[in-house]
Amino acid sequence: MSLLLWSNILILITAIVCLVVVYWYFKDSPKDIKATYLFALFLVLAIQVLIIADLAFVELIVEVLYIAILTFVYIILLQSIRHLKSEHYRYPYPFVFTPVFLLITYPFLYDINVLKEVIINLIEGGGIAVIIFLFVYHINAFKRKYLAYSGLLSFILAMILASFLSQKWIYADFLWPVFLSFGMILVTYSFTYLLRSSANK
């Protein structure tokens, strides 16, 4: 089994685990966040299936789906931040859909590879930074804080390995999918716990 195929299968299995976690543990949480989260995970599944199937035009389709995933991640974060605020301080609900502009502007960057990669890295880093802020700000709500911290650390390590070390270190391409998988599962569990605990207050 090639390294690329192994990483795709690992992320595919991870996405299925996360789907189960979100479906079962989001029962008392806001339905809009649950629906958006599930849809984003279905897109992750779709990407892995397309890569494994090695269909025609798969690169373009995967790239568009990945931008869609990043868009939905930001929508989830904005929905969650709004939900965790007291009612008097919540911004208007339509504001949570502003990340859709990522999808709208993407075609203008499609042919500019260097700029596109930089922007995608910034978007990924920004998403992780928002999750860190969200978890740190609400850290007392977590029963198992070490799971939240471990998930965040795994995400950061996966991003560093994939973005900066994949061409320089022979083990980077093996390790980043492992850290990404741990990060996805732990952050998903911690995220659902945070929203469930806030819903029960």
Map each language-model feature to its residues.
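Non-cytosolic membrane-interface motifs at loop->transmembrane helix junctions
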Residues: F57-Y66, V114-E124, I170-L180
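Membrane-interfacial loop-to-transmembrane alpha-helix junctions, especially the N-terminal start
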Residues: K27-L41, S86-F97, A141-L152, N200-K201
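Membrane-proximal helix-loop-helix units in multi-pass membrane proteins
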Residues: L77-F133
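Hydrophobic transmembrane alpha-helical segments in integral membrane proteins
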Residues: M1-C18, P107-E124, D173-F174
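Juxtamembrane "helix-exit" motif on the non-cytosolic side of transmembrane helices
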Residues: V49-V58, I104-K116, I160-Y171
